């Protein structure tokens, strides 16, 4: 991530193992916000559509209990993946969808990441002074499809040895996201209020988009080894703060652990579940639909039982 190459101070970077590729953003959201894992749920399931039907403990509800204002943002239809119904059940006070993004700019018909940054800053500046905020933003700019129908993208990115319009468009959009992240960090570097920014991908694009990369290696998406296939479920993540935090590079994690890692890095008191997750990470460093190596172990079974309780049986009592 170019915008962070000069910002090693107070930064943690690494790769996040997620349970989806090419789509189903909601499942990565679910893992990050709840600390639960898709590895324990049926293949093809979407918790936002099938399992979250009542108040469900999450990072948002926990931070709300600590006095935080909690905001969710997604610059598209509010009903997508049932977000308008799910976010309140996860403890968000407010949800801003596309109709709340006034005066936004667009890329390929989607509200762009720069406008998302503007909305984050606007929300931060309007919140109650002295009250901390948790702002969860799911961007839309880089959503598929990627075609050669849009010729107005600035700073076209190509890969030597390939002639793929899809790949070029995708990488150009990622470059624009990098610029938006830099804009966000530049703003909060100037703020006195302690702030942590966590930036991560929801999933990689479809096989068709990255096929030219494999072709350069003499391979195809259809003949990848198990290890190579797992690479298709990795996305970058960054934790940055405008105050002193421990620094780390090239870390490996999975989406269910990232929320607890963020809280620990920020110096925010952890919930009992988050403390549990960080202990579990020592025994199971990675867990996702693609990382089930610990299946059947005591650590796996204990985690699975606790997740079932929190997702299906929890009644709001501590």
Task: Write out the residue ranges for each language-model feature.
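Solvent-exposed soluble domains appended to multi-pass membrane proteins
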Residues: 1-318
């Amino acid at each position: 991530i170019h915008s962070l190459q000069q910002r090693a101070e107070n930064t943690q970077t690494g790769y996040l193992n997620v349970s989806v590729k090419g789509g189903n953003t909601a499942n990565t959201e679910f893992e990050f916000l709840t600390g639960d894992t898709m590895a324990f749920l049926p293949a093809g399931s979407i918790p936002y559509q099938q399992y979250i039907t009542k108040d469900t403990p999450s990072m948002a509800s926990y931070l709300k209990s600590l006095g935080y204002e909690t905001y969710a943002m997604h610059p598209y239809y509010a009903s997508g993946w049932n977000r308008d119904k799910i976010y309140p059940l996860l403890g968000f006070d407010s949800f801003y969808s596309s109709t709340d993004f006034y005066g936004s700019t667009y890329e390929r018909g989607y509200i762009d990441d720069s406008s998302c940054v503007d909305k984050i800053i606007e929300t931060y500046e309007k919140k109650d002074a002295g009250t901390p905020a948790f702002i969860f933003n799911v961007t839309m700019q880089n959503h598929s499809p990627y075609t050669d129908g849009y010729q107005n993208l600035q700073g076209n990115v190509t890969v030597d040895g390939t002639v793929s319009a899809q790949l070029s468009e995708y990488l150009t959009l990622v470059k624009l996201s990098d610029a938006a992240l830099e804009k966000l960090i530049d703003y909060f570097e100037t703020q006195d209020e302690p702030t942590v920014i966590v930036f991560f991908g929801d999933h990689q694009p479809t096989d068709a988009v990255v096929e030219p990369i494999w072709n350069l290696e003499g391979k195809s998406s259809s003949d990848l080894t198990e290890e190579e296939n797992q690479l298709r479920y990795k996305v970058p993540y960054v934790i940055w703060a405008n105050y002193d935090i421990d620094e780390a590079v090239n870390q490996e994690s999975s989406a269910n652990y990232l929320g607890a890692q963020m809280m620990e890095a920020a110096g925010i008191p952890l919930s009992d579940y988050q403390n549990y997750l960080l202990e579990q990470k020592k025994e199971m460093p990675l867990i996702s639909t693609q990382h089930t190596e610990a299946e059947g172990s005591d650590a796996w079974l204990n985690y699975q039982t606790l997740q079932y309780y929190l997702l299906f049986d929890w009644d709001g009592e501590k």
